[in-house]
């Protein structure tokens, strides 16, 4: 095993009990998929492989904290816990700082109020990797899991679907609204050329799903 594989194996042991608490789609399976995307993007786009791989595997600690605290916890608030995960890893001080930086900024969106504030390839790849797991078939499944956990309706036909109303999932009128308002935008939100190509294919599937779902639930067949 190379150095990254050894470190990820250590993180798997640390992360298992912590992330097994999650039922919202931010569990170990999500971390493993995000890691795969991150390493693929790194192979095409470059960047520090250790920083990218490790940050991909521990980026969602704030989601577990959100479940525990009963409120949204930002990535910034999770940094002390993230530090505990990486303190004993065989990394340089600069690499550890870079991991913390990437994790802190991984939930920035071009269509969000604040936009994207980072430009280093490691942070951009982490954003893309996390967002790719919200696209396509897996993204749809995760959206419904999150919606169910937060008591959201699957679909509320009384509320129009708008293109300009992004919010956190639990504030949307239904899971279908969240898929429409956020997941459909992710292809245009990707930072790297490689991620844009992957997301474009996934987004076509999401659009087809939404069209069919609304037809089946409203009876407005086309």
Model-predicted regions and their roles:
Residues 34, 73-87:
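An active-site-proximal "capping" alpha-helix that borders the catalytic cofactor pocket
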Residues 24, 68-72, 89:
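Short gly/ser-rich anion-binding loops that grip negatively charged ligand groups
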Residues 1-16:
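Short alpha-helical hairpin
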Residues 49-68, 74, 78, 99-109:
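His-Asp-centered metal-binding catalytic motifs of divalent-metal-dependent phosphohydrolases/nucleases
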Residues 89-125:
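Hydrophobic, well-structured mid-protein blocks that either form specific transmembrane helices
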Residues 2, 19-28, 32-46, 58, ...:
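Divalent metal-dependent phosphate-bond-processing catalytic cores, especially two-metal-ion Mg2+/Mn2+ enzymes
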Residues 16-21, 64-67:
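A short, mixed-charge helix-start or loop-turn motif at secondary-structure junctions
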């Amino acid at each position: 095993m190379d150095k990254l594989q050894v470190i990820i194996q250590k993180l798997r042991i640390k992360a298992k009990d912590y992330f097994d608490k999650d039922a919202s789609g931010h569990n170990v399976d999500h971390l493993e998929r995000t890691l795969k995307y991150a390493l693929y993007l790194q192979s095409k786009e470059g960047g520090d492989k250790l920083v990218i791989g490790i940050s991909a595997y521990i980026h969602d600690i704030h989601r577990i904290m959100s479940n525990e605290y009963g409120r949204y916890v930002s990535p910034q608030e999770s940094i002390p816990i993230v530090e505990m995960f990486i303190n004993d890893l065989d990394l340089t001080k600069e690499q550890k700082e870079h991991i913390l930086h990437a994790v802190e900024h991984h939930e920035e969106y071009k269509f969000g109020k604040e936009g994207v504030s980072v430009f280093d390839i490691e942070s951009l790849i982490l954003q893309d990797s996390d967002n790719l797991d919200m696209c396509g078939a897996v993204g749809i499944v995760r959206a419904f899991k999150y919606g169910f956990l937060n008591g959201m309706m699957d679909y509320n036909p009384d509320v129009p679907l708008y293109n300009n109303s992004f919010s956190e999932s639990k504030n949307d009128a239904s899971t279908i609204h969240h898929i429409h308002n956020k997941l459909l935008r992710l292809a245009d939100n990707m930072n790297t050329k490689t991620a844009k190509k992957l997301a474009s294919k996934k987004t076509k599937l999401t659009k087809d799903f939404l069209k069919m779902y609304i037809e089946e639930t409203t009876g407005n067949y086309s």
